[in-house]
């Protein structure tokens, strides 16, 4: 039984509301999963940093014992051991040992009433016997390797913690690969997504994919081995790819923000200029700028291959001038541009929403008899003119207001962006009713614009939280005014890498134009992907699928023929 046009539109309205609730639940689920992974990642690194906390070096000959005792009391590792066992001790000699014990030579004295525990002093190792309070003196040369490393001021990461951190980092790497590969496959397979406005999104996905494949695996090995065993040549190549890919990812984010800003503030002018050739040129400029930042250490300055003790390391060039140049070009300038651009986009979106609410209020008053369509405060009712620029945007002129509906996936979680120009012109459909299809579509676009404002906050928050700590540390390190623990440096570095995992989630998964292809690709239902996307787009525009619309048109055509 075929539904009438009015019944079908009512049915589609209920269906759209149900779909919106389902999409909201999906977004909450994705956000919760992302937050959980982020918290898991952060907690693992906190445990990793706590485990790698080093203890002060052993007492060297000629060092004052008071300084040794002061350094020892500042060590959190030994304070925890001392707090867990009540120790009292006494000894002879000229030196005082750790805690309340004292010792001399290469031995330390301690007395404990709890379970057997070994405490490393700066002059030796003390160990208590089980069941009595006698103290056994153990020379440092006779202690196990782990205790020797404790005495030497080093710490071996517990195996379980190391395995846990490695698993979390592997999950980050695999998630980054899967997410960005899905973006590339979706754009290649779906004709609707092969538009110039998505070229930068593909470039972003490729840069993040390179981070996951070329940078993260070596960084994981470096973390596990805790030293660089692959030679200076491979170190230079790895560092160059690291700087190149991470900088390209950040600059792609900046270019996307500028692209969206121009599409909203200058829709008519920029819509014509946004051609495939120019977007490819923009992508080339992004990668060229990233190369200009990554190549100087490889070709001219050189990277760091040894630390002060001669141990092999692999660190980017710490030249002060280069660090200023690299941090400004890779982060601080793009961050400033993105903050300005997204603030302007947020203001434009808010202004549009307020103008459309005001226009709808005037129109409602006119229809209820409290106002008049020809009154000065209400714009005249008119018809809607639509024009397509051929690159993914539809321009609509209604009264005194010019609107642009961008069908390119970007900031809006619904897959579109709405821009307005004018001093508050009115909005009306050809029927002059608030329940007309034009007003339903307009309300739908305004709802998407509100979601876009929320997405802006997510974008800036994720980008800033992930990369700001690392680049603050990058500016501090060349001054050598403070010692930065290696675990803290690793945490900030991997936090920046995690941004490559969040990018496909924020820029693609929250966008309906990408979310549906992702689902179909993951379920291996790619044969009818373009047909399904075309039907969804048709339904969003007209409120009914093509088959039903054709059927209703045939019914009206048959009724007209019978009347004639």
From Swiss-Prot:
Renumbered residue ranges of the record's region Disordered: 1-26, 367-396
Which parts of the sequence lie on the Extracellular side of the lipid bilayer? 223-236, 303-330, 477-487
Under Pfam families, the record lists: 7tm_1 (PF00001)
Q: Which parts of the sequence are annotated with region: 9 X 2 AA tandem repeats of G-S?
A: 89-106
* Agonist binding: annotated span: 238-247
| Predominant location category | membrane
Any idea which GO molecular function terms this record carries? G protein-coupled amine receptor activity; G protein-coupled serotonin receptor activity; neurotransmitter receptor activity
**TM segment ranges:** 29-51, 165-188, 199-222, 237-258, 279-302, 331-353, 455-476, 488-510
Positions occupied by motif NPxxY motif: 503-507
- GO BP, sorted A to Z: adenylate cyclase-activating serotonin receptor signaling pathway; chemical synaptic transmission; courtship behavior; female mating behavior; G protein-coupled receptor signaling pathway, coupled to cyclic nucleotide second messenger; male courtship behavior, orientation prior to leg tapping and wing vibration; male courtship behavior, proboscis-mediated licking; male courtship behavior, veined wing vibration
Per UniProt, the ranges with Polar residues bias are 386-396
Which residues are listed for ergotamine binding in this entry? 242, 247
Cytoplasmic-side stretches of the chain, per the record, are 189-198, 259-278, 354-454, 511-564
Matching entries from Gene3D superfamilies are given as:
Rhodopsin 7-helix transmembrane proteins
Q: Which SUPFAM superfamilies match?
A: Family A G protein-coupled receptor-like
Topology class, membrane = Multi-pass membrane protein
What cellular component terms from Gene Ontology apply here? Answer: dendrite; membrane; plasma membrane; synapse
The chain's disulfide connectivity reads 235-314
UniProt similarity note: Belongs to the G-protein coupled receptor 1 family. 5-hydroxytryptamine receptor subfamily.
Q: Which named protein is this?
A: 5-hydroxytryptamine receptor 1
Q: Which organism is it from?
A: Drosophila melanogaster
